[in-house]
């Protein structure tokens, strides 16, 4: 049986603010929104989380920026039981993230920065 799975590919942090149904995108307007949810995403995280939930040891193989978001990305992976020892940090670009725009009652959209992927 396989002892450890290595998952490789796209890795990002999803930033999902809680949005009201009546959200308006009026230029210059201040909108009151709810708390921010931060979840590690992309194929590395999503596949890794499922494998770990099935009892497998999982090692992530991806690249993040040598920045605060890269540190957060690695912490979020570690928090769900995925090894981050093979993740490469680079100063040549920034870490990947998506802003998940999901007002109540409306299908979500993603505003994405590819970053180190």
PLM feature segments, named:
Residues 1-61, 71-72, 78:
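Glycine-rich phosphate/adenosyl-contacting loop at the front of the ribokinase-like
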Residues 29-31, 38, 53-117:
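Conserved N-terminal subdomain of the carbohydrate kinase-like
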């Amino acid at each position: 049986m396989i002892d450890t799975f290595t998952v490789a590919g796209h890795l990002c942090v999803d930033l999902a603010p809680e949005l009201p149904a009546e959200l308006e995108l009026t230029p210059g307007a201040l909108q009151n929104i709810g708390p921010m949810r931060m979840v590690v995403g992309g194929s590395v995280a999503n596949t890794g989380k499922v494998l770990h939930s099935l009892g497998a040891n999982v090692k992530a193989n991806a690249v993040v920026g040598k920045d605060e978001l890269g540190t957060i990305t690695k912490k979020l992976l570690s928090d769900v039981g995925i090894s981050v020892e093979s993740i490469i940090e680079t100063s040549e670009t920034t870490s990947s993230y998506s802003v998940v725009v999901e007002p109540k009652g409306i299908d979500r959209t993603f505003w994405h920065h590819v970053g180190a992927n």
